[in-house]
Amino acid sequence: MTRFRLGLVGAGRMGQVHVRAAAESSLVEIAAVADPIAASRLNLAGNGIKTYETAGDMIEAGEVDGVLIATPSNTHVDTVADIAARGLPILCEKPCGVTAEEARKAADVAERYKVHLQIGYWRRFVPELKQLRDDIRAGLLGNLYLVSCFQWDEAPPANSFRATGGGAFIDMGVHEFDQMRWLTGQEPTNFRVATSKTTFAGAVKGDPDAVQLLCDLSDGSSGLVSLGRRFPPGDACWTQVFGTSGFAEARFFWPPDGEAVFLNALQAQLEDFVQAARGGAPRGATASDAVAALTIAEAATELLSRDLNKAEGNNVR
């Protein structure tokens, strides 16, 4: 079968990772890349990858079958709209906008032009998590008490990013919110948040080093999302599930093997997107899933902001 020719919009860090993930696939190839920054384009030039300054130029060349969007989050909606109007299927990196309203706009424009839009929540393609989901859905753990999802980074990003990135619940937590919904089939509600005052690289207003969200799930169980900016062993993600018939833990992204898990999941996600673009049943996240994750992230961020402002007011007194 001829490999699906994917055009990449955005040649930054995540775009470069996608190129690596696609390199071993027999179903899909990154055939072209568009990025307005010449140096970024040069990083991916060669190996048969053609480069363009704009997505429009890339598509008009007529050599791509679909588009992968890996631009900054605040450009996702406009980029989706541009590609959808040209009739090509789209795989957009998470979170598909920086607000739930933006994700809704992306969903609407994809529906208007009748194009397939998939969102890059790659954890749905991690075999260990897929097995955990199957076990939960089959009732092997019984009725659930608690589902806990953790994401802790080795070191925080630059303070300039933290000050403008929307905070941990948006730039990190959307993965956990999507993962919790996907694993359990339940909707999180009734959110409560907590923070730690401990700092590693200096306090950043509005973005504590560690934040936690406790919620109810619609089946009557509880959910916990734990996000941290500093985990010395390395970037790590893991999940724990407590039920009436058992306990399960998935340390699916754990030093030093996290990168291999990441690349394999990204490759599986790309190949699933190709199958869906060719008319198969999609398994990846939809724009509606993106809306749901961002809705939770916005609610959590609002609660966090309220609590931080209250604490700041108390300190002033």
Swiss-Prot record:
<comment type="function">
    <text>Could catalyze the NADH-dependent dehydrogenase reaction involved in rhizopine (L-3-O-methyl-scyllo-inosamine) catabolism.</text>
</comment>
<dbReference type="GO" id="GO:0005737">
    <property type="term" value="C:cytoplasm"/>
</dbReference>
<keyword id="KW-0520">NAD</keyword>
<dbReference type="GO" id="GO:0000166">
    <property type="term" value="F:nucleotide binding"/>
</dbReference>
<dbReference type="Pfam" id="PF22725">
    <property type="entry name" value="GFO_IDH_MocA_C3"/>
</dbReference>
<protein>
    <recommendedName>
        <fullName>Rhizopine catabolism protein MocA</fullName>
        <ecNumber>1.-.-.-</ecNumber>
    </recommendedName>
</protein>
<dbReference type="InterPro" id="IPR000683">
    <property type="entry name" value="Gfo/Idh/MocA-like_OxRdtase_N"/>
</dbReference>
<keyword id="KW-0560">Oxidoreductase</keyword>
<comment type="similarity">
    <text>Belongs to the Gfo/Idh/MocA family.</text>
</comment>
<dbReference type="InterPro" id="IPR055170">
    <property type="entry name" value="GFO_IDH_MocA-like_dom"/>
</dbReference>
<dbReference type="GO" id="GO:0016491">
    <property type="term" value="F:oxidoreductase activity"/>
</dbReference>
<dbReference type="Pfam" id="PF01408">
    <property type="entry name" value="GFO_IDH_MocA"/>
</dbReference>
<dbReference type="InterPro" id="IPR036291">
    <property type="entry name" value="NAD(P)-bd_dom_sf"/>
</dbReference>
<dbReference type="GO" id="GO:0006740">
    <property type="term" value="P:NADPH regeneration"/>
</dbReference>
